[in-house]
Amino acid sequence: ERFGSGTGPFRWAPELIAGSLPLDEWETIEQKIWSSPGTCNVMGTASTMTALAEVMGMSLTGASSVPAMDSRGHQLAAAAGRRIVQLVWDDVKPSDIIGDASIRNAAKAGVALGGSTNAASHLIAIARRAGSGFTLEAFDDSGRQVPVLANVQPSGEYIMHEFADAGGLPAMLTRLASQLELEAPTVTGATLGENISHAKVGDPDVIRSMDNPVATEALAVLKGNLAPNG
């Protein structure tokens, strides 16, 4: 069994505490948790928010999916450095990129990724700073309308480097294109649609189609006496 984060082996912790799981077996389980440096190798908060930053147009295309030890990371870092200097010279500000369309796109992408539910609070905070009217109800609508397409743990079977190898975020966005506002601007100087126009899905089991999703509904906002506002 493969793990992409520390939450995977937690179910064996009671056995370790009770003494029914030998220490050497626990150490074997621990060694399977991390495959490289970097963030946890599942669609947790870090992987989710870097992806949403890319969808909102605030990072270079494909940057969010590159594994920590991949040489493409160095290339993208250099390209990002060059690009941000040009953006400063051109007086392009975050407010020129992040708007209602980009935030709605990010919400839908987060749902399709099977991403962290922390994305809801982060996106709402970003929206408020950007002057957008995006709300928790809007996030709930996305959760009910958009299926999970990324077959990545914890919602699916695979781990992040396999998602990257299958085409990563740009490829998944091509599957989701009918739900997106593709004219949204990005820091590349091109639109979101133009950025993903050449992306291809390398493994249709890792990045599913709208007709064959991992799950038909991803999330719903719950309201009740403990959380009347959701």
Model regions: which residues?
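Catalytic or ion-coupling anion/metal-binding cores of large enzyme and transporter domains
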Residues: 1-230
